Structures are given as structure tokens and as C-alpha cells.
């Protein structure tokens, strides 16, 4: 009986450990309970939450307090990996320079967050939210939720030289930045990137060689209005999130990359 009881205890303990959300930050692991119990954990109210599209209040920790010193000049990016394959490349300067203040919001298992709009899951257990995001022009794709890890990385173009714009057009150069911010979290381009939600937009054929420019613009704005399928993940980018000038720049960049 002691053996059976011991085995049952181990099984329950293992289940409890497995059920405890854990986030990796630059190779160090933090449990949700550990983060919620920190002395610097505070309540944050976000008036216009990007993911929930309404006011939300969270308990979280200032993100800067959790980050170790950067590893070198080229490690100027914070790579945020989510459990669904979304991978945001957030400029470290955006996190550290002031203005907008990033927090790591932590979902309390005893008080779970509501499900995201049109989803069955919440944004938890870990979610990067911003106080005063307008102060630093924080973009929608820089609010990664369902986080699995945060780590320092090289800037995307240094890490993947094939992302460099092929065009001398300044608009295309601006489009490169738009692509890295909005598209790279889910897509790759000629093998560059680690996002796994959508297809590679450069190979085996560049996207603008099989989709017309008007078609691409329509997909970016309202993908469900162009085509739908059961596993569709992409939602549209309205003009508030992606202004027309940024969409023009993105198209110019992808045109140059298709040559």
C-alpha cells in the first residue's frame, strides 16, 4: 500500500508541476506563482487593450525588472515566442528607452482571464502589455500573448540577411520595417524568421507572383473576405493598426523582394 500511495503522490505532484504555467526568460524559468508573488508585482489597467479590444486590468511585473543585461551590440531585439507559433521581434530600445512601459501580465489560475474575442482561450498565462503605448508608437503585433519564452536575439536583418530590401526605393526600405513588425511574427520570407503560423511569403514562389497586388491588399485588410478555410488564423489589419502609407510601403518591399 505504501508503494501505491507513493506512486499516487508522485503522479499528483507531477501533474501539479505540469499544470503550473512556466515562462522562460533568457534561459531562466519563472512560474506564474513566483511572478505573482514578487514584491514588484502591481495592478495594471489598460484602457484599450489590443487583444481584448476593451479596458482590462491585470496583475503583472515591470518587464524591464525581469530582463538581464543585453549580451552585446547585435543583441538588440527581444524575441517573444508564443505557444501557437507566433514570434514577435520587439526592438529592445522600445522596451528600455522610456515612454511606453511594458509589463509582463500574469494570469492567476484562481482568477482566470476571459476568453479572447472569437476565441476559446484567454491571452494567458503570460502576456506583454503596455502602459501609455502611444508614447512610443507601440504596434499591435508587439503585444504578444500566450507567451512561452522571451529571449535576447540579434536584430532580424542582421540575423537573416535575406530580409534586406532589394530595392533602392525609400518606400521599400520602410516596408522592410513594416514586414518585420507585422508579418514576420507569423510568416517567414525566403527562410528568414521563425514564425510558423502562416506560409513563407518568398518561397518556393514570391507572394506577388501568384497573388495580385489588389488581392494582397485585400488579404491584409480582410483575409476572410478573400478566402476562408477551417484552420485560418489571420485577422485583418485595419487602417488604425496599419495605416495606408505602411501598407503601401509593405507592398513596395514585397515587390522588390519578388524580383
Residue ranges and their predicted role:
Residues 11-16:
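N-terminal signal peptide c-region/cleavage motif recognized by signal peptidases
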Residues 1-8:
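Bacterial N-terminal signal peptides that target proteins for export
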Residues 175-190, 216, 234, 250-254:
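The canonical Cys-X-X-Cys-His
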Residues 154-178:
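Electrostatic cytochrome c docking/interface patches
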Residues 196-202, 222-251, 257:
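Axial heme c-ligation environment in periplasmic c-type cytochrome domains
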Residues 19-156, 259:
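Structured, non-membrane catalytic/scaffold regions adjacent to prosthetic-group chemistry
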Residues 62, 179-185, 190, 197, ...:
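Short pre-active-site segment immediately N-terminal to redox-active cysteine/selenocysteine motifs
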Residues 190-221:
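Gly/Gly-Pro-rich "capping" loops immediately C-terminal to redox-active cysteine motifs
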Amino acid at each position: 500500500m505504501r508503494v501505491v500511495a507513493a506512486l499516487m503522490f508522485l503522479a499528483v505532484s507531477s501533474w501539479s508541476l505540469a499544470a503550473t504555467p512556466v515562462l522562460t526568460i533568457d534561459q531562466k524559468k519563472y512560474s506564474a506563482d513566483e511572478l505573482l508573488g514578487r514584491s514588484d508585482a502591481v495592478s495594471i489597467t489598460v484602457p484599450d487593450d489590443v487583444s481584448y479590444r476593451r479596458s482590462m486590468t491585470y496583475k503583472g511585473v515591470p518587464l524591464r525588472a525581469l530582463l538581464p543585461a543585453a549580451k552585446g551590440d547585435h543583441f538588440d531585439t527581444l524575441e517573444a515566442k508564443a505557444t501557437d507559433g507566433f514570434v514577435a521581434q520587439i526592438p529592445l530600445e522600445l522596451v528600455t528607452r522610456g515612454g511606453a512601459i511594458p509589463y509582463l501580465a500574469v494570469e492567476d489560475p484562481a482568477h482566470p482571464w476571459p476568453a479572447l474575442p472569437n476565441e476559446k482561450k484567454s491571452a494567458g498565462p503570460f502576456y506583454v502589455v503596455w502602459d501609455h503605448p502611444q508614447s512610443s508608437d507601440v504596434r499591435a503585433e508587439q503585444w504578444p500573448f500566450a507567451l512561452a519564452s522571451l529571449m535576447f536575439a540579434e536584430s532580424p536583418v542582421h540575423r537573416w540577411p535575406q530580409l534586406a530590401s532589394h530595392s533602392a526605393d525609400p518606400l521599400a526600405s520602410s516596408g522592410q520595417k513594416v514586414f518585420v513588425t507585422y508579418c514576420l511574427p507569423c510568416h517567414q520570407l525566403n527562410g528568414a524568421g521563425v514564425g510558423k503560423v502562416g506560409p513563407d511569403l518568398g518561397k518556393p514562389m514570391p507572394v506577388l507572383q501568384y497573388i495580385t497586388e489588389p488581392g494582397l491588399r485585400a488579404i491584409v485588410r480582410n483575409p476572410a473576405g478573400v478566402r476562408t478555410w477551417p484552420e485560418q488564423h489571420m485577422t485583418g489589419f485595419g487602417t488604425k493598426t496599419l495605416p495606408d502609407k505602411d501598407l503601401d510601403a509593405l507592398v513596395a518591399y514585397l515587390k522588390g523582394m519578388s524580383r
